[in-house]
UniProtKB/Swiss-Prot annotation:
Species this protein is from: Staphylococcus aureus (strain N315)
SUPFAM superfamilies: NAD(P)-binding Rossmann-fold domains
A Pfam family this chain is assigned to: DUF1731
Recorded family membership: Belongs to the NAD(P)-dependent epimerase/dehydratase family. SDR39U1 subfamily.
Protein name: Epimerase family protein SA0724
Length: 300
């Protein structure tokens, strides 16, 4: 039986990942910030907001999956920016300190990250070979998060970093936010409309995570995005078609930056990111193009 330790296991990605892992011979320990009782013999919860939580984590953990982190979908006040950073750094460091104090390190760590690692660009295509230093707040979060995760290599753990693109899901996240203006017939171009959206269907994301965990040759950063990214204007048009709604309005960049503040970088300052490394290992995307993904997710 394989032992998993998961942070962020009750979130959008984590909950679906847990349901998939349960299909195998496994036991899953989920770290949460509140007391929770499990009715499933394959799952146990540990409240790591309480002192002594370390002693409740099983000794024989094989796989650590670190998805913990405050949501980006809130206005980035100075206080919340600190929360965004610390929620990722402190949780990763706590996991490292836990296993550093033990004689048995996990075989593999899968640590979430984001395509915000790469600088915004309208023309460049980014693969995993591109390396950079932080250039804005979001890239600094990503850079620090990855750096803290890489400490696990000192313990002999194989470290896999998944740079998530825009996750498309019916359970929340970006797609539900993007659907709202179209629902009320006010969807359209955002800014220039030329910025890239490097997206991924959540089912492909879950399968990619498990593929990388189980592939012993996989290590380092992986772009977890669909093979065919789209520019925002075409993305919006495709979404409108799937919802049988118009795509006719325009929200200027200046207006969006005034309304959203620094959070506007998530929709305006984006990158074209390609999943070359995971494809080279043989991973096959089920939803490689946007039309196919949206038709699966949207039943209007």
């Amino acid at each position: 039986m394989k032992q998993y330790l998961i942070t962020g296991g009750t979130g959008m990605v984590g909950s679906q990942l847990v349901n998939e892992i349960k299909k195998s011979d496994s036991h899953i320990t989920i770290l949460t910030r509140h007391d929770q009782i499990s009715n499933d013999k394959k799952i146990s919860y540990v409240n790591w907001a309480k002192s002594g939580w370390e002693h409740k984590v099983p000794q024989n953990i094989d796989v650590v999956i670190n998805l913990a982190g405050a949501t980006l979908n809130k206005r980035w006040t100075p206080e919340y920016k600190q929360t965004l950073m610390l929620s990722r750094i402190q949780s990763t460091q706590a996991l490292y300190e836990l296993f550093k104090s033990r004689n048995k390190a996990p075989k593999v760590l899968f640590n979430a990250s984001a395509t915000g690692y790469y600088p915004p660009d309208l023309f460049m295509s980014y693969t995993e070979v591109y390396k950079t230093l932080p250039f804005d707040f979001l890239s600094d979060i990503v850079y620090q998060w990855e750096r803290f995760a890489q400490q696990f290599e000192q313990l002999g753990t194989r470290v896999v970093i998944g740079r998530f693109g825009m996750i498309l899901s019916n359970e929340g996240g970006a797609l539900q936010t993007m659907k709202l203006p179209y629902k009320y017939y006010i969807g359209g171009k955002l800014g220039s409309g030329q910025q890239w959206y490097s997206w991924i269907h959540i089912n492909d994301l879950i399968q990619a995570i498990l593929f990388l965990i189980n592939n012993e040759s996989a290590s380092g950063p992986f772009n977890l995005t669909a093979p065919i990214p789209e520019r925002q204007n075409l993305f919006g048009y495709t979404l409108a078609r799937a919802m049988h709604k118009p795509h006719e309005t325009w929200a200027p960049s200046l207006a969006m930056r005034l309304i959203l503040g620094q959070m506007s970088t998530v929709v305006l300052d984006t990158q074209k990111v390609l999943p070359n490394k995971i494809q080279a290992l043989g991973f096959q995307f089920k939803y490689s193009n946007l039309k196919m993904a949206l038709e699966d997710l949207i039943k209007e």
